[in-house]
Amino acid sequence: MVAYHLLTLISLGLGSHCASALQYGYNQLSTHKDSAVVAGAFPAINGTHLQSPAFTSPGTVPRGFSDGTSGPTRDETMEGFMRRLARSNSWMAYHEADFKSEEGRKFPYMYLSASNSSVENPSSRKLRVWLQGGVHGNEPAGDQSMLALLGDLAANQKWAAKLLEKMDILVLPRYNPDGVFYFQRYLATNFDPNRDHIKLARQQTRDIKELFARFSPHIATDMHEFTAGRTFGPKRDIIYAADALFSAAKNLNIDEGIRQLSEELFAKRMGKDIEAAGLRWDPYITLGESSSSKLLLLEAGTDAKIGRNAMGLSQCVVFLCETRGIGIAGQHFERRTLSGLVMAKSILQTAVDNFDEVYNTIERGIRRFTNSRNDIVLSDKSPVMERTFGMLNITDASLFDYPIDFATTTPAEAVLTRSRPRAYLIPPSWPDIVKRLEVFGVKADKLPYSYVGPVEALNVTSVTFDKEYYEGVVTTTVETKLVERNIRLPAGSYLVKTNQKNAALAFVSLEVRTLYPF
């Protein structure tokens, strides 16, 4: 069998991102608050005491939060809150990343540890947990739930100590400070930060990815919100009833044992914890297109350009956690933030309660993946099944289970596979490709000698360009033919071996037959 795979690329020299109806800054959605009838189905939860700025210091909340033109917590308020917690708790360390946002804003984060560990020097035999919020700037319960978690840990010292016996935690509450400032989904440059995890078009994405790769977490969580008022049904009179939607990473190049741990242990516990808090949940979904009259919902996909899967491809347990909030301004904000907090706490508590199983399963999964000779998955499909989904009737606020077609990815089914290359060869004229791989934490060796020998290569036999820009590029559909050939590459070429922990990120980036490669 041929040992190496030659990377050949089509380069597209394109200008800036082009998207209709976007301006520079303040790309805000219209606000459609729940009616009094619908709002009655989302009451405040008795006994809720959230320890985050929007609730402990309500005077700091901007007026625009109530009408959907601002988030509830300005950068300086958030930073002051985090600094005060760090001053009062020796196990909390306040940091500012050594990079800035596209408009020059800071990235404060908290490192929580009971030892003298750090991002670059973590504790041995402890779980490393990465928690992030605020990826989309108009989803304020995402970062607020992270701040509420920090406040909850500070207020419950025994619980915090119990967690930190088993884990070190990095909390990046605000991934997209420019988006939060403009109260818009996008980065300042109007790129979607949650679609940039493979192509790495923006320096901000690369900087955060490098921090993530250095920390190399066992567990990661990405906090978001979903649209509250989207209607369905023949009369357009039903909406999602859930407070929370969540999903594990689904890409089939993540070790199967890690994926099963996510679904069988973490997801099941999370559902129970959400219900115990008096809240409602369902799996994360998007709307599908169907030729029938039946509603088709698509379970969270396997696409690597999404943060959940991109993080998971570093062989860790990852959850996307979404709360019901886009489009309703500050309505139900306590309940929304509580929903995010419950999910984050569930993940932490599940990991601690099952520490040996979680730690050993992930570490074994990393070793198994690193040494695997199994085929890699280039494309997959989602089997469609019948099930019900929790809905709410907007005319009377009745809750009911609505029959749907459900395209499931638990698990997805592999369609196109190929034998796992031992390595990829990259000519010295493509150092920018190598730099992107290194952002992922993928190691590339620079060869001090010329390479002469057999490789597998893909000859492109046809190319079809899309008619529109997508996130700054024109996407391309190619047909290829696999050929074996002898090549000569000069010294200074790069060898990317696949017996490394983050190799799956090389697979999805370099294999042209995956969905969104370089």
From Swiss-Prot:
Residues 71-351 form the Peptidase M14 domain. It comes from the Eukaryota. Residues 1-21 form the signal peptide. Coiled coil: none annotated. Glycans are attached at residues 46, 116, 393, 459. GO terms for biological process: proteolysis. Zn(2+) binds at residues 136, 139, 224. One of its GO terms (molecular function) is metallocarboxypeptidase activity. The active site is at 322 (proton donor/acceptor). It is found in: Secreted. Its EC number is 3.4.17.-. One of its GO terms (cellular component) is extracellular region. Extracellular metalloprotease that contributes to pathogenicity. This is Probable carboxypeptidase 2. It comes from Trichophyton verrucosum (strain HKI 0517).
